[in-house]
Amino acid sequence: MSEHDPRGTDRVRYGTINHEYGLKLATTEPGDDGPVWMINLMKYREVAEYGDGSAGISGREADDRYMPVESLRAVGARIVFLADVEEVLLGDGVMWDRVAVVKYPTRRSFIEMQSRPDFRRQHVHKDAGMQQTIVIGGVPLSIPKSTDEPAAVQWSKVPHPPTGDDGPVVVVHVLQFHDVDDAANTPSEMQVYQSAAAQVALQHGLRVSGWFSAEGTIVGDGRPWHQIRFHTFPSRRAFVEVVQDPDRLAHQKEFRDSAISDTYTMILRASIDDLASSVD
């Protein structure tokens, strides 16, 4: 899992720290503070680099050793989503390995965890295993309820229900919009697209696990992000049917592509998925 100390240098081996957002996390007044969901995109080294001659393990194995469950519990935080990346469909060529979401009770609790001795002792494993990471602080975004959208269909009744060979998948969209200063405001072009896409996706069993507006990227590569959306489908085949729908494709070309300036879209297989209940 990917966390960090925002008070240190501007750059760590796996990304660049945004100190302005780190200061916001540390200084938000208690009356204005509240839960924050830290959304982690993780790319591992093939072999962990400890730098001390330690026997070689994979970057993923090093991250498993790092996972700071006890430190999280001590500050009231918990892992609400953990998934392996099955495929990166859209992006800049980075083949992400894992996506995780940690819910913190407050922004300040995120900072407090970084100072814990037990957390700092574990950090050596993350530093050794992580090649690149993006960590985005998000808050829940209202999901539009258009009156003309069809009701969600039970998975047992969709054309491509989950099977033993093709179970549920989560599709995550990490979005940067053109000229949007407020991540909570979805551009009008995107609103048109998402309404049309919902007409198709809901018939194939779409369940929205959570939409988040990005209030800051605490570790990354300098790019700003606006929204992160998690969509669950009963099977990969169900998602593919949505992708290939002609009407959805037409709306993508006319509206979605003009609204988005940068994105990652990934198919995930989750081992922990309490995301929807964590937002309620």
How would you describe each model-predicted region?
Residues 1-99, 105-112, 129-250, 261-280:
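Short S/T/G/P-rich N-terminal loop/turn motif that feeds into the first structured element of a domain
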Residues 118-124, 247-253:
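A common structural junction motif
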